[in-house]
Amino acid sequence: MTLQLRAINKRFGERQVLNELCLDVANGECVALLGASGCGKSTALRLIAGLDHPDQGSIRINGAEMVDVPAERRRVGMVFQSYALFPHLNVWENLELGLRIRGGSAGTRDERIRSVLEVLQLSGQARQRPSQLSGGQRQRVALARALLRDPLVYLLDEPMSNLDAQLREDLRPQLRRLMIGGEQPVVYVTHDQQEAMALADRIAVMREGCIEQIGTPRELYLQPASTYVAQFIGRPQMNLLPAKDGVITGIRPDDLRLDPDGSPCTILSREWFGANQMLLVRCDRGDLRLVCPGETEIEAEPRISWPSACEHHFDAVSGLRLPSD
């Protein structure tokens, strides 16, 4: 099974939300659409689901054109940020409703619901209403509903953005086990790069309705195609040195080091970054972030350096990556 988007355009009023968007998602592959609010990632998902109609372009699932196919006939499993559960129905009834609409015997429906509730560890909440559930439990009910659709494609729109950090971390393995790595293509929309890098096989970084770069998490980190991608991927974000001779130089904070033979600098601030320290230092090239081990002794007048092989170079006008020498 494959998902293909070709030259998708979508405008709302005067605003061009998607501009010639092209995307391929293979069988069992998870592609994350990553970008800032308003970049078009959720609109792309709604077009695939059939909840909106593109102005131009093609959407194909397994080679079949979907643009004019109603949403209810597209067989997509969509999980929303807001859970989209019926508040007056309990968990079992929320799951059963979709199965009733699609037909089948009561015995088959019951067996499938019991099975998915057991897998998602929700058997004890089957008769509870959404208001009686925790945020993590409500999201698992939404996942269960998507699984019961037997979809050709999974579409997940910021499914964990309403959960706290620990719950998101706990749910990731379940998401990967149940939806990602199976037979269906998965499109995962998020603004959280850590989530995208943890779950996706490839990440499409979106900007103003276009894909700025698509690649594996490692490719985007090591070979960012532009200053936009360079600063969007990686935490702390890449240092960009002021342009010199039309070239912007980028240095990852992990590649900077304290060096007694380096350039003098002044420490502006220091904070803990996991087990490491993150320093904000000022040197003759500007203000830079530097990450070093937590036990590092910081001198009163530190000096810094970095290997030239770790530099990234970008055109100062276009922001695009320059080829290596």
State what each model feature region is:
Residues Q4, D24, R60, R303-S305:
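ABC ATPase nucleotide-binding domain
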Residues C30, A71-G77, Q81-A225:
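ABC ATPase nucleotide-binding domains
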Residues L34-A36:
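The feature captures the beta-strand-to-loop junction immediately N-terminal to the Walker
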Residues A49:
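Helix-to-loop junction immediately C-terminal to a conserved catalytic motif
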Residues D55-S58, E208:
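Conserved coupling/switch loops of ABC nucleotide-binding domains, chiefly the family-specific signature
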Residues G57-E65:
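Conserved ABC transporter NBD signature motif
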Residues P236, V247-D325:
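Non-catalytic connector elements of ABC transporters
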